[in-house]
């Protein structure tokens, strides 16, 4: 299999320093998280400062309270993302090793779990401060895509979450024995850069659409519309990219080489696709509901 692109010589660490005999490093993935949070915070502040964007020209909350909301959201992302990975992808392993559930630094986060964590955190926050739930959801979801874009780029830099073997001109030869373990391939194994596919779809394309709807089409005046577009857009993007992503190792067996979580004969769906289908359905319901209500 011949690929045009070799994986660039990139380090997962932006820089590292040694203090008092201990090594500290800033990783690209951590920087992506930080930058995504800062961008989301600024977008939320800008939106709440523009009263004309909202129903009855009234933002759901004051710009000064965004930082307080952000604390709840970060907790929802971390707790939900970790528990989602544990429950959706490796429940048997963590049932046998429960102390490792809290070891977030070892890796293992799931977007769908993080999303559920954010939903719960935002719902509790709205109850506590008497904030319109759908407008709060719109405020949050229109800010998420830049973080998704940066996170997927960091996945690429880390040479992780790569795609299935491919001989397309833009396929990439990722380093490491796991990436090179391609049954039936002689020589170097090239793979779909599925991280970049996700960055383009759920980050750049979806993010541009959401910002255009908010700032050019007045979508925030229809509570739930932006939330619906985000849910359906992310779900559809993830569903499509799952056809190119390397299947989750815990689902791969000799009789199930594609790592399908649900299978009927030769066909089925991955866990990512199964979790994305409810997102698409719920997103479409939100969109239809919002469009039925006069702005």
Swiss-Prot record:
It is a multi-pass membrane protein. The keyword Transmembrane helix applies. GO terms for biological process: lipoprotein biosynthetic process. Keywords: Cell inner membrane, Cell membrane, Membrane, Transferase, Transmembrane, Transmembrane helix. A 1,2-diacyl-sn-glycero-3-phospho-(1'-sn-glycerol) binds at residue 152. GO terms for cellular component: plasma membrane. Its EC number is 2.5.1.145. It holds the Pfam family LGT. GO terms for molecular function: phosphatidylglycerol-prolipoprotein diacylglyceryl transferase activity. The chain crosses the membrane at residues 28-48, 69-89, 101-121, 131-151, 195-215, 224-244, 268-288. Catalyzes the transfer of the diacylglyceryl group from phosphatidylglycerol to the sulfhydryl group of the N-terminal cysteine of a prolipoprotein, the first step in the formation of mature lipoproteins. Belongs to the Lgt family. This is Phosphatidylglycerol--prolipoprotein diacylglyceryl transferase. It comes from Ruegeria pomeroyi (strain ATCC 700808 / DSM 15171 / DSS-3). The lineage of its organism: Bacteria, Pseudomonadati, Pseudomonadota, Alphaproteobacteria, Rhodobacterales.
């Amino acid at each position: 299999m011949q690929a045009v692109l070799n994986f660039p010589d990139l380090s997962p660490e932006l820089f590292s320093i040694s203090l008092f005999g201990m090594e500290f490093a800033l990783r690209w993935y951590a920087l992506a998280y930080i930058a995504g949070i800062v961008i989301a915070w600024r977008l939320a502040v800008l939106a709440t400062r523009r009263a004309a964007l909202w129903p009855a020209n009234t933002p759901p909350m004051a710009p000064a309270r965004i930082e307080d909301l952000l604390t709840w959201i970060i907790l929802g992302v971390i707790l939900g993302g970790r528990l989602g990975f544990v429950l959706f992808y490796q429940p048997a392993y963590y049932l046998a090793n429960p102390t490792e559930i809290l070891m977030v630094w070892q890796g293992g986060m799931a977007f769908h779990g993080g999303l559920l964590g954010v939903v719960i955190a935002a719902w509790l926050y709205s109850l506590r401060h008497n904030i319109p739930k759908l407008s709060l959801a719109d405020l949050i979801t229109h800010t998420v895509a830049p973080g998704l874009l940066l996170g997927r780029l960091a996945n690429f830099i880390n040479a992780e979450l790569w795609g299935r073997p491919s001989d397309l001109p833009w396929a990439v030869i990722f380093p490491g024995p796991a990436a090179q373990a391609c049954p039936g391939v002689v020589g170097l194994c090239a793979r779909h850069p599925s991280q970049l596919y996700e960055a383009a779809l759920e980050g750049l394309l979806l993010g541009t659409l959401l910002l255009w709807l908010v700032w050019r089409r007045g979508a925030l005046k229809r509570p739930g519309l932006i939330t619906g577009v985000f849910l359906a857009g992310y779900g559809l993007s993830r569903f499509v990219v799952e056809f190119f992503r390397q299947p989750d190792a815990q689902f791969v067996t000799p009789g199930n080489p594609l790592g399908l979580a649900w299978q009927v004969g030769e066909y089925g769906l991955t866990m990512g696709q199964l979790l994305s289908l409810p997102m698409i359905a719920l997103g479409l319901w939100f969109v239809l509901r919002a469009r039925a209500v006069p702005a």
